[in-house]
């Protein structure tokens, strides 16, 4: 039999040796496995050649393959998160058509929920009409101050959705903080930031833990919702007076100095009227004040300190809504086509789309 001092540490067996068969090699005198030679030898789980590859670690142990989709997805938001008026019916929620957790296979929204289900249905617990009451916690009219309560609602509801905890939460809040009666009555930025922290703290401290995937969408360029319907008599006369966003919609007729100016909300042109200038100031506050809070608080205060490392801020401010993207009822909320646009842009700008051919330039 082989001398015991010649046996490698992982105990090969040969001759008359006896040992746990689960730890024994087949050949007496076989060499110690060589990690990185491309041959799966005794004691190795895998060996695809290069050390530290995508399949094997430096010890030739298999690297667990993470699912390319989350285990489930919850939604926090406002009227956009409820799909309000997506079908053109004023005030009616359309949860099935929401950009994040929508579930209607017959529409063209192709929500994040549907993309995850189509990508790996075995790993992902999809939203549907029976689960939506637990998954979609968005409430029409919600402001950032409601983030705390909606986050707690997710924590309380997640036990009802496999695997019993929230693996991903999509968040779009802030639209109703910037939409107000005037520029002066928009939510105070300091309060906005503190309310944002309150919601993040709930998600970070809850049983979701630090590994929860958060997709935090920036406030879209709401200016383009006005622009898309500004020449529509019905919208200007009958719909917009009842929409709670008068710092954008009041004086709905275009008084910009030129069509070039109206199509360039980032700059004030000589001769721009007071309504035009107010709308451009509204646009700038979203760009320069509120969205930077959403980005910087997450990255500089939480992630820089090792918290919520699987969260990501998605900036969709450059998305331009056209007439087809705005419903014809209240002339303000995204239509199903608008929800589809938001779904595509949010998904393709997120880390979940890394291998998606549909997001290729």
Tell me the role of every PLM-derived stretch.
Residues 108-127, 198-215, 275-315:
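A structural motif corresponding to the C-terminal end of an alpha-helix
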Residues 72-84, 133-138, 167-173, 177-179, ...:
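Structural recognition of the beta-strand scaffold that forms the well-ordered cores
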Residues 224-361:
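Catalytic His-Asp segment of secreted/periplasmic serine-dependent ester chemistry enzymes
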Residues 83-89, 147-148, 180-185, 226-230, ...:
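Short, solvent-exposed loop/turn and secondary-structure capping segments
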